[in-house]
């Protein structure tokens, strides 16, 4: 009895209850597809959404749980991981809403698509709390392989096949690079795999000044930068976004990116705590390159999906300001921005899907005069694009204000000024699309808008897509007007996470803000 109680306490399986619910949901979807008839299969996406909502409720009940370590230290269910797991689950819910009509119209299996997406969600959720090298790599591969499959899901579309092949080849290379960096950490720590123990062993052996740790840092950051589409590891992003099914692109731009930032925070803050200044410097360079290239190249794009691809690269640069600041405000603003980015970006992709389903194109020029034929779509897409640009009083404005303020407080003056300039550049290409939809006269309508089909929301799968768009627009608007609760949530997730607090204190000591004598031994 004592032995079993000891094992149960060390496993602490309750920390992965949300993931357990998603696993059960995945099994129900697959079994329902096998044994259910056509009518039963119609309800599978809604069953998947219900399971994800149950997982979100389980995450809510786990908030401020005093026992967060599970599976012998391999998983940490702290408040920070809860927020990131919630972002990934929410992004999957909205993506499923926009996928039903899109996937059915292509003639492929919706249940298989949902199963792959739930597997990717599981990988992202596990990655957000992974605290051990093996757990990190398995979770990363679960997310990556599922993403490759979703990218090439439209087997009859040559562009989808090309995107999947590019994503697979570059993704496999980045995984190998990340794995090599992780193996160096394993060797430098004397064969340890838990992140806390790795950090302690490296500090005890005075390995913080070793060349091996510097090489490990470079390789690990290269792997993470691929996942978050940071320049110069962004080459796959425009082609994959343009060729992949649009719902998949929406998930990659939010869920996959959130998982990448969760990994960046936990791995770098814990395992590389002895060389914080070095990885801050690297991320400063990545942020500069991402903001400049992402926003400048987006100006020249003619495809909506390709423009949003470069936009997501620029947005990743903005988020990296919070990571580089390394303060309470920096991490909090980073989490807050990802929370609001979830809704404004998925709302924009919902609009792109609606337009492409009705016209068969995603060319920006074809949106000319859309307001005359579809005011709801024009309003929703315009609000989401303006929020991405940071126009007040929408959510994106407050997200950028918090990020820039955190960077300024951390004395990253040059980085913040560059972010302001590139943010203004981004406003231009977002407003260009809005202007094209709203301002154009009837005789200036594009051919696609002139031949715009009658709006019929009663078609199968169209109502969920409408719900996804409306929810995203409402959340984007309300998150801007009522941003304080969301920022309090982000701030609580940071201040209640011990690994972040210890790193923040060490950073302030190294900068001379706190004398080391004031810290208890």
UniProtKB/Swiss-Prot annotation:
Disulfide bonds: none annotated. GO terms for cellular component: plasma membrane-derived thylakoid membrane. This is NAD(P)H-quinone oxidoreductase subunit 2. It comes from the Bacteria. Belongs to the complex I subunit 2 family. It catalyses: a plastoquinone + NADH + (n+1) H(+)(in) = a plastoquinol + NAD(+) + n H(+)(out); a plastoquinone + NADPH + (n+1) H(+)(in) = a plastoquinol + NADP(+) + n H(+)(out). InterPro entries: NADH-Q_OxRdtase_suN/2, ND/Mrp_TM, Ndh2_N. It comes from Crocosphaera subtropica (strain ATCC 51142 / BH68) (Cyanothece sp. (strain ATCC 51142)). It holds the Pfam family Proton_antipo_M. The gene is ndhB. GO terms for molecular function: NADH dehydrogenase (ubiquinone) activity; quinone binding. It is found in: Cellular thylakoid membrane. It is a multi-pass membrane protein. NDH-1 can be composed of about 15 different subunits; different subcomplexes with different compositions have been identified which probably have different functions.
